[in-house]
Regions:
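Short amphipathic alpha-helical segments
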Residues: 29, 38-49, 84, 93-104
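Short, positively charged interaction helices/loops
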Residues: 53-91, 108-116
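Residue-level signal for short amphipathic helical patches enriched in basic/charged
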Residues: 24, 35, 39, 75, ...
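Generic cytosolic/nucleocytoplasmic N-terminal low-complexity/intrinsically disordered segments
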Residues: 3, 29, 111-112
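Residue-level detection of beta-strand scaffold positions
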Residues: 16, 46-51, 71, 80, ...
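General nucleic-acid-binding
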Residues: 13-45
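Short Lys/Arg-rich basic patches
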Residues: 1-20, 33, 56-76
Length: 116
């Protein structure tokens, strides 16, 4: 008999991925996740949605590439991750670069809240 968790309902759309992300930004995202009592994966997804909204055409793509990346196990919505992959390919950047742009947005959004 397979184990069925009663704590968290399994979402079949969410898939595990190994993703290379900036270590320092990931630490900040994890701190924000603890403060907001949520999973850092959900914050990463919020950032990915922002990146999809912001980077629609090549004219507004300014990507800051990180040299401080580490492979991290993440869990994302398969649909959302696929859309980010397609957008990154269309823009000529790495998927991880777009995810990190989303991380910058999440960090910036929460830093503004702290200073208000």
């Amino acid at each position: 008999m397979a184990y069925n968790s009663l704590i968290r309902i399994r979402d079949e759309d969410r898939k595990n991925r190994c993703t290379r992300l900036d270590i320092d930004m990931l630490k900040q995202i994890k701190i924000i996740a603890v403060e907001q009592d949520t999973s850092y994966n959900f914050l990463l997804e919020d950032g990915m949605r922002h990146a999809l909204e912001r980077f629609k055409g090549r004219h507004n793509v300014v990507i800051v590439k990180s040299n401080n990346r580490k492979t991290v196990n993440t869990t994302f919505s398969e649909d959302l991750y696929s859309r980010v992959q397609v957008r990154a390919e269309r823009l000529g950047v790495n998927t991880n670069d777009l995810i990190e742009e989303g991380m910058r947005y999440i960090i910036g959004r929460n830093t503004k809240k702290d200073t208000e």
